[in-house]
């Protein structure tokens, strides 16, 4: 059975897409069959981080009725990318029916992959909530700033209230060390559990890194760089391992692969 994991964030600029790309590549390198759906439709940029020129995108699924195999782009690590399309106005405001069509379009991959990673749009938009709720688990990325906490809480609240979804974990990005990361997580969890019936899990942390910043410019995932700091290598590996073994809880509503 395919495990599906959404990578989300309450706001942009916290490292969500970088985490989604690097952990997807890491999972692929461990032998898992992984597909990455860039669901930030119209503003998608996962293909840039992977240095992959794409001709077919999700827009071709919708407008040209192509099948999912026609828009898959395999990378050097074995990761299969489903690009969301960038600069396509029609993708910026997809309605519920179009989002449903995309979710169902992935059904043929059921027997071809082990894990589907979904890079959702930042914030608590209808698209972000719907694609997150269609997954088995959601991993939210935040940074130790009040605005990030507030926006991440708003996202989790919307996900819980609208979709009754509570399988959520947290990655703390841009922190000095694990002690600081766990302190930030504990503070955030205290806020969430005070108002919502959700038992957040800690999934890992990442430090601020010139390697990650440079990887965006060089269009090569940080996890593939020889200059990758040992702490980053370990942390990406730990987070990817968490993703591979994340608990799956049954919820109602529309799900990837008709679960």
Locate predicted features.
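Walker A/P-loop phosphate-binding motif and the immediately C-terminal alpha-helix
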Residues: 2-40
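Hydrophobic anchor at the start of a short beta-strand
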Residues: 33-34, 116, 138, 168
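Hydrophobic residues in beta-strands of the RecA-like P-loop NTPase core, especially within AAA+ ATPase
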Residues: 36-37, 118, 172
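P-loop/Walker-type NTP enzyme "switch/lid" segment
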Residues: 37-111, 214-218
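Conserved catalytic-core segment of NTP-binding enzymes
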Residues: 121-204, 214
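Beta-strand-loop-alpha "switch" segments that mediate conformational coupling across diverse proteins
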Residues: 196-223, 236
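NTP-binding/hydrolysis catalytic cores, primarily Walker-type P-loop NTPases
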Residues: 217-259
């Amino acid at each position: 059975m395919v495990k599906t994991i959404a990578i989300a964030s309450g706001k942009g600029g916290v490292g969500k897409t970088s985490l989604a790309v690097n952990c997807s590549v890491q999972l692929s390198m461990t032998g898992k069959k992984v597909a990455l759906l860039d669901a930030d439709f119209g503003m998608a940029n996962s293909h840039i981080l992977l240095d992959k020129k794409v001709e077919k995108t999700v827009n071709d699924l919708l407008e040209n009725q192509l099948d999912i195999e026609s828009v898959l782009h395999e990378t050097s690590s074995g990761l299969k990318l489903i690009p969301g399309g960038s600069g396509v106005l029609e993708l910026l405001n997809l309605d519920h029916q179009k989002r449903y069509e995309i979710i169902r379009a992935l059904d043929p991959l059921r027997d071809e992959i082990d894990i589907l990673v979904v890079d959702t749009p930042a914030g608590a938009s209808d698209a972000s909530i719907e694609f997150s709720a269609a997954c088995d688990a959601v991993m939210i990325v935040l940074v130790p700033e009040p605005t990030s906490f507030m926006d991440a809480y708003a996202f989790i609240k919307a996900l819980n209230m609208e979709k009754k979804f509570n399988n959520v974990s947290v990655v703390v990005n841009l922190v000095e060390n694990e002690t600081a990361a766990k302190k930030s997580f504990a503070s955030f969890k205290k806020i969430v559990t005070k108002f919502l019936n959700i038992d957040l899990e800690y999934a890992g942390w990442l430090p601020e890194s010139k390697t990650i910043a440079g990887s965006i410019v060089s269009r090569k995932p940080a996890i593939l760089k020889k200059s990758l700091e040992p702490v980053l290598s370990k942390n990406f590996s730990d987070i990817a391992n968490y993703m591979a073994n994340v608990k799956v809880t049954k919820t109602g509503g529309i799900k990837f692969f008709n679960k």
